[in-house]
């Protein structure tokens, strides 16, 4: 019996709802597979913890997480706590503290979900966006001076290192090489940002020589938004900076139907530390407690987690179950359905178990 230790951090808003659904699905997979076991410990860190203790997580938070094989994260952010506090107090310290430098965000149109793009079906939009996750625009360097005065100044410094850019570029090329189309698009803004972005272009060309079987091109980030919208079938694997990929991956999720189906993995490729898996969507306080949060993104990122742990069969079984459920029309309101979180979760669990309840659920 293979055993794994998972740290669950539901955090804010709908985070607890979707993480609970994700853990239920993982339990169904355990029962179906019978050859692995997941042991979960839940941490109550987040905005409520901040209101009580003045910090989003304790000072020894990273030390507590080191013993786990992976981290299952919900969402962070609260209306009454500044966003920079919630982000820099919890999610980013984990990503940067554990050197999870590869943020991997797959996107595709799932069966049964109608995307906003005309004449675009499941086979036309199937991407993986690789986001540099350790430096760049989110390096945390900068400052403010003369606060409150007319001459107040704020600086936000983007830092790009040869080591950081090279390793994410190599990761992206390897990923593109492993995918059927072997296509990679490198995204920068090197016409206007003439230092770090030009270095990105140069390093991309250098790393490309190691992967002669990968066809690659480069795009300016503004032009990339147009290409993603008008010519989605021309793209496959995409690599971009921390900020650019953050924005592009949200666009990708929307083009595929909803951020509610968009997953992400924060990976330490060298496996020195636990990697973290989370849905892309935010805490969504507007629907918190209503029971209608879409759990599909959490299920998909659970599949990413299983694959990272080496449980590829279980990951494939989970995604097959998800696609059976969406194709049957069991969908939450954000993707045009009437089902709630519980109904989608139960349908996926039934699909994993091989139950025939799907048709009944779709007809209700």
UniProtKB/Swiss-Prot annotation:
Source organism phylogeny: Bacteria, Pseudomonadati, Pseudomonadota, Alphaproteobacteria, Hyphomicrobiales
Protein induction: By tartrate.
InterPro entries reported for this sequence: ICDH/IPMDH, IsoCit/isopropylmalate_DH_CS, IsoPropMal-DH-like_dom, TTC_DH
Pathway where it operates: Carbohydrate acid metabolism; tartrate degradation; 2-hydroxy-3-oxosuccinate from L-tartrate: step 1/1; Carbohydrate acid metabolism; tartrate degradation; 2-hydroxy-3-oxosuccinate from meso-tartrate: step 1/1; Carbohydrate acid metabolism; tartrate degradation; D-glycerate from L-tartrate: step 1/1
UniProt-listed Enzyme Commission number(s): 1.1.1.93, 4.1.1.73, 1.1.1.83
Binding site for Mn(2+): 222, 246, 250
Textual note on the cofactor: Binds 1 Mg(2+) or Mn(2+) ion per subunit.
Superkingdom of the source species: Bacteria
Alphabetical list of PROSITE patterns matching this protein: IDH_IMDH
Entry annotated with the keyword RNA-binding: no
NCBIfam families: TTC
Keyword Transmembrane helix: no
Organism from which the protein derives: Agrobacterium vitis (Rhizobium vitis)
Function: Has multiple catalytic activities. Apart from catalyzing the oxidation of (+)-tartrate to oxaloglycolate, also converts meso-tartrate to D-glycerate and catalyzes the oxidative decarboxylation of D-malate to pyruvate.
Record key words, sorted: Cytoplasm, Lyase, Manganese, Metal-binding, NAD, Oxidoreductase, Plasmid
The name this protein goes by in its record: Probable tartrate dehydrogenase/decarboxylase TtuC
Catalytic reaction list: tartrate + NAD(+) = 2-hydroxy-3-oxosuccinate + NADH + H(+); (2R,3S)-tartrate + NAD(+) = 2-hydroxy-3-oxosuccinate + NADH + H(+); (2R,3R)-tartrate + NAD(+) = 2-hydroxy-3-oxosuccinate + NADH + H(+); (2R,3R)-tartrate + H(+) = (R)-glycerate + CO2
Protein's cellular compartments: Cytoplasm
Gene Ontology CC terms, in alphabetical order: cytoplasm
Stated family: Belongs to the isocitrate and isopropylmalate dehydrogenases family.
Cofactor(s) listed in the protein's UniProt record: Mg(2+); Mn(2+); K(+)
A Gene Ontology molecular function term of the record: D-malate dehydrogenase (decarboxylating) (NAD+) activity
